[in-house]
């Protein structure tokens, strides 16, 4: 589910989480209609659910979705990833072996869940009504589950890492070990940032990024451990907007964690918004963030990918070099909705991915109108994994 469909579930989500009923909502995070309807992607919908008691796990790309969707817990989960940019992207991925997948399933927990069902042989009280004398105490009784949950997730990530050779953590750091400028983000922008970080560090800079996987419950100690001690400037990127708030959700969580640990004296912290309604976030946007962090007085609040000539929050983006892996071939096709261009390109990339050793990536840009609108197909092929979740702007083939 996603967007308004997810928001309609919020009253039930409070009950599901309150009764500790294990379930998973897989959410391709999409925009919630505000001043206008938009069917495309950002984190507006999942951020509206963060107070329900659901745990929240975020994946950055297609491969991570395949790997991390197997994590289980008594606490219900929202397992989310970027709508359209990740959910509609075609990539070559390594899939689970079913024997390995079977080992990830705790059958004792399944049996315990089944025994929790309504049964006259196992009577229990449900749907109770409580007054002010005991409601508060019972509401606090779930604390232990949420305190233990990050360790449960870490345990399962450890199993995944052991079986698949990955390195998933609650917060993954990427970049120079002695970075002085760091970005914190979650979702597909992390892959864009990885390419920029590789380029900048290869040219003498010292930058890095913390990728958030487990967003709720938020483990501040794990986040702080992931930030290099050398960091002097920090930018937190959110893919949502809360009008009237002092900052966006992830930014406020990070600021609180830093304040409680007395780390504010060590670094500047700024927050930005990006990608609302699937606005493209190219490498130029990430370069602009690192450039802003160099300043003595950077913007406390900023936006990426647009030109804000009203409130002047946008960062200036300059022409930047290509950061995709050497040897990547980029192709761009224009067509009209319904003319077969998108379908032909989907089949072509799947054939090349299935029958060659090439890595492939396909993403299709189109509007939300009926048949006849312009479609743009963005295809990439290469000998190295492709981490480029943004539109092609320097095509080898058109």
Task: Identify what each model region corresponds to.
Residues 233-324:
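Peripheral docking tails and interdomain loops at the edges
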Residues 77-172:
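Conformationally flexible catalytic loops at phosphate/diphosphate-handling active centers
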Residues 8-13, 34-40, 67-68, 88-95, ...:
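Short acidic, glycine/serine/threonine-rich loops at helix termini
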Residues 177-178, 182-213, 327-394:
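Anionic-ligand anchoring segments at beta-strand to alpha-helix junctions in alpha/beta enzyme folds, i.e.
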Residues 35-54, 220-242, 364-397:
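A structural-propensity feature for long, helix-poor, extended segments
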